[in-house]
């Protein structure tokens, strides 16, 4: 009786030998795609568990976020749609209404570390971004 694992391993090796570089390229692309899919899942999970005192007003919850891992760095890109604020106050007996609108905001936070836990630090940085760089 033949060993099925050895047979499949031999068959895979023969396929690799027959196809050569094309198979290597496909395997590399497959690994890169799997790494990107893991990064997207990790991002979704990290956003889901993020909690702060700002609640739904936190930039982490309001922004459209993407996470990229390259050979040398990590990049968290964010996009925030237009926002509108309305404020009413009384001056004497007359109400004054102040309306403010801002356009799209896009940016990225980038680091060049080799930590696998970097996503959480980048999300915390995005969360506190309004405190660091007040936009309005």
From Swiss-Prot:
Belongs to the adenoviridae E3_15 family. The keyword Iron-sulfur does not apply. Coiled coil: none annotated. It holds the Pfam family Adeno_E3_15_3. It comes from the Viruses. Keywords: Early protein, Host-virus interaction, Inhibition of host caspases by virus, Modulation of host cell apoptosis by virus. This is Early E3 15.3 kDa protein. GO terms for biological process: symbiont-mediated perturbation of host defense response; symbiont-mediated suppression of host apoptosis. The keyword DNA-binding does not apply. Protects virus-infected cells from TNF-induced cytolysis. It comes from Human adenovirus B serotype 3 (HAdV-3). InterPro entries: Adeno_E3-15.
